[in-house]
């Protein structure tokens, strides 16, 4: 995205290993619209949660647009997400979370042991909230597609672990095994 926003700037992506081949890329991944919270004590906290949820929504929309534009097969599955617990005493936490979700307009459903085991295929969990907004993807496939479509001003350096970094006046110097980079702005 930075390459698109700043087409006249060089953008370097540096990965310690092959991009899209790390542990997170080998697992299933979720794009989420909500994260678990057991309730809020103030309207300010609720506003902050809503801001986070809005960011998640923007992210999901951007990824969906990308996979459509580039016809990416990343096993996109709008299956929703379960916030589940094996402890029945966690029902109160989930009730508070359900109230928060409802206040913010997120559909959610309480599911208990028998129905839950039918849906999940295990009797381990006792209680859960189901939300529709979670999307299961294969992150490795998505990352590799993003790598294949990098803008011309974005350069990828793989198998390049960061050895050291230090701030020098108005810039940051990053030291790698056989090279270094000095830049005004760096995102770690």
State where each predicted segment sits:
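Flavin (primarily FAD) binding-site architecture
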Residues: 188
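Flavin (FAD/FMN) cofactor-binding and adjacent substrate-gating region
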Residues: 37-41, 65-145
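Short, hydrophobic/amphipathic alpha-helical packing segments
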Residues: 56-63, 143
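Glycine-rich FAD pyrophosphate-binding loop
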Residues: 3-26
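Glycine-rich active-site loop/strand segments that organize a redox cofactor
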Residues: 22-55
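Helical element adjacent to the flavin cofactor pocket in flavoenzyme catalytic cores
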Residues: 98-104, 123-185
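A generic structural signal for alpha->beta connector loops
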Residues: 8-10, 71-73, 105-107, 153, ...
